Amino acid sequence: DIIFGMSNDIKQDLGTVLQGKCEPIDAVTQVKVASNLNILCAPKNPFTVVTAEQIADICQQVKKYFDYIIIDTGAGINSHVFDIVEQSNLILVVTTPDPICVRDAQMMSDEFYKRGNQRQRLIINKVSKRTITNKIIRDLDEIIDTIGVQLIGVIPEDQELFIATGKGFPLPYEAPSLIAFDAIARRIKGEDVPLTIKIN
């Protein structure tokens, strides 16, 4: 809700749904700057326990209203995340070029493969020439080979994105990251989009 500038507009969230105070669809809020995007916010109480079964039930109830349902698990590795993500048709493994993040992504992907989930795609986020120039990584192929997941997109480090998410504003059309997001979305939809990588 914060990155969409809607933190003061959310009346119901996942916690409200789990408490039985409202139906899942009633807790869904339309994003102001994108008429085709809706969000169901995480519980305000960080200690709220959400099970994979509850997520599956909520998705089942609301799927007739939407073309796609995106489950954002946040960073970190735990069994809870694996159980929830197993409800998905496609897993997007997101990492930055940082070696620690790459290692975590590799561990997560390996666990998904062990559980029989082959439908994974890799997104490399916050990529800049600096990460390669400073030899933090040799190249993007090194990350792809380490994690072992097919690449679906690279998002360049973008000051416009940093400002937009901090203020809850939409990205300007010329923002490099917006171009990358659009290409990723089209690939998810099944379009044949060339994988072009523009790094600032």
Task: Name every feature range the model reports, one short phrase each.
Residues 40, 63-80:
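Glycine-rich phosphate-binding loop used to anchor ATP phosphates in small-molecule kinases
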Residues 38, 67, 89, 120, ...:
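Conserved acidic residues
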Residues 103-117:
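Conserved C-terminal guanine-recognition region of P-loop GTPase G domains, centered on the G4
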Residues 114-200:
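C-terminal lobe/tail of nucleotide-utilizing enzymes
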Residues 9, 44-46, 76, 98-100, ...:
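Conserved nucleotide-binding/hydrolysis micro-motifs of P-loop NTPases
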Residues 1-64, 159-171:
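P-loop/Walker-type NTP enzyme "switch/lid" segment
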Residues 78-99:
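Inter-motif core of Ras-like GTPase G domains
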Residues 41-42, 93-96, 123-125:
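Conserved beta-strand segments of the P-loop GTPase G domain that flank and frequently precede/overlap
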